[in-house]
Amino acid sequence: MIFHQFYSILILCLIFPNQVVQSDKERQDWIPSDYGGYMNPAGRSDEERQDWIPSDYGGHMNPAGRSDEERQDWIPSDYGGHMNPAGRSNEERQDWIPSDYGGYMNPAGRSDEERQDWIPSDYGGHMNPAGRSNEERQDWIPSDYGGYMNPAGRSDEERQDWIPSDYGGHMNPAGRSDEERQDWIPSDYGGYMNPAGRSD
């Protein structure tokens, strides 16, 4: 029974490793990556951080010790493979970038016009449903977590106030000025990207 309780607590700690409220300075070191690990492990310098940013699905965006040229060939895509398979030209790379949820952002051999209609959105459908005009497309781009980035029929000014943030709230709460907006953009994982009153 004691061992059962111990392992239950251990599992909870692994699932919720950073529930304690951190200060702003600590938060910078504790921003979780999308799928485990931290974007800047606490205590690491800026130079080390560049080498330790985990990719979304394993590995690191810049494996430690690699040059900028090598890094370009080693950035893992979100769902397997690499955004630029080593040795491929820029032209080939454009055709080989996997989309987030299957297929390719530009299926090999498709024209730019066709590509615009075939980029899958992150959560189903397409960013520009085939056959829609650019104006209609602007109203139909699904947001990452429900709704639409520009609800159909809203003006550009209204759209700015209605873009949902990735995890609740809005990137620019309606009625706030550009200066206030900078202080109110929610971060992806709680808090705000620029806490109110802080300098740039």
From Swiss-Prot:
Residues of the propeptide: 24-34, 45-100, 111-144, 155-188, 199-200
Signal peptide span: 1-23
UniProt key word Isomerase: no
Single GO cellular component term: extracellular region
Annotated effect of mutating residue 192 to F: Increased potency on delta-type, mu-type and kappa-type opioid receptors
Modified residues (Alanine amide): 42, 108, 152, 196
UniProt keyword terms in alphabetical order: Amidation, G-protein coupled receptor impairing toxin, Secreted, Signal, Toxin
Cellular compartment(s): Secreted
Tissue: Venom gland.
UniProt name for this protein: BmK-YA precursor
